[in-house]
């Protein structure tokens, strides 16, 4: 028997995550600690499923989980997919397409992605493709606002794992990290 605990974050095009979404909330961390303690005391395992689109803080709690699975917002079939992986019906064979930093601010791109503005889209319109333009005429066009209307990419060649590898920065999970249930060997002939 195992406990499967799922944590999620919502974001998408035009609705990036807030800076504080990188961190686990106090109640999420408390839940991980409580479930881990209870299951380990009974000789059972805890699997944490991350239903996310970009990294969250894992360094402080990953030792409490026996496995961490990144689902990366898989949609309505997530339950079936995770069940198939955890029961060994399918081989997960996934590798991380990004680096999980130890803390927010460790990656140079963090400075360019703060969702620090008020999102005004009506909740009923999310995902509908409906365009809500005001009928009000502006006398002067609005100046584009950084991190709302555009984003500067200032990392140069040090995008993603290149920064962490080049500067030897400690990470929680490196780019390409991942396991599968398959055993294999590489051989050069």
Predicted ranges, named:
Residues 1-39, 49-63:
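Hydrophobic helix-and-loop "lid/oligomerization" segment in the mid-to-C-terminal part
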Residues 42, 51-189:
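Secreted, periplasmic, or luminal enzymes acting at the cell surface/secretory milieu
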């Amino acid at each position: 028997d195992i406990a499967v605990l799922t944590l999620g974050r919502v974001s998408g095009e035009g609705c990036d995550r807030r800076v504080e979404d990188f961190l686990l909330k106090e109640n999420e961390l408390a839940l991980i600690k409580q479930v881990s303690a209870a299951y380990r005391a009974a000789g059972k395992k805890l699997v944490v499923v991350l239903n996310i689109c970009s990294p969250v803080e894992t360094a402080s709690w990953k030792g409490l989980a026996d496995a961490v699975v990144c689902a990366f917002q898989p949609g309505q079939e997530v339950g079936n997919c995770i069940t198939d992986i955890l029961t060994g019906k399918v081989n997960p064979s996934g590798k991380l397409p990004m680096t999980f930093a130890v803390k927010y601010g460790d990656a140079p791109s963090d400075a360019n992605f703060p969702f620090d503005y008020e999102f005004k889209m009506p909740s009923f319109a999310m995902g509908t493709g409906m365009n809500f333009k005001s009928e009000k005429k502006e006398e002067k066009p609005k100046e584009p606002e950084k991190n709302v209307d555009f984003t500067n990419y200032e990392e140069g060649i040090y995008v993603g794992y290149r920064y962490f590898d080049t500067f030897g920065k400690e990470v929680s999970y490196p780019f390409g990290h991942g396991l599968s249930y398959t055993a294999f060997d590489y051989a050069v002939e």
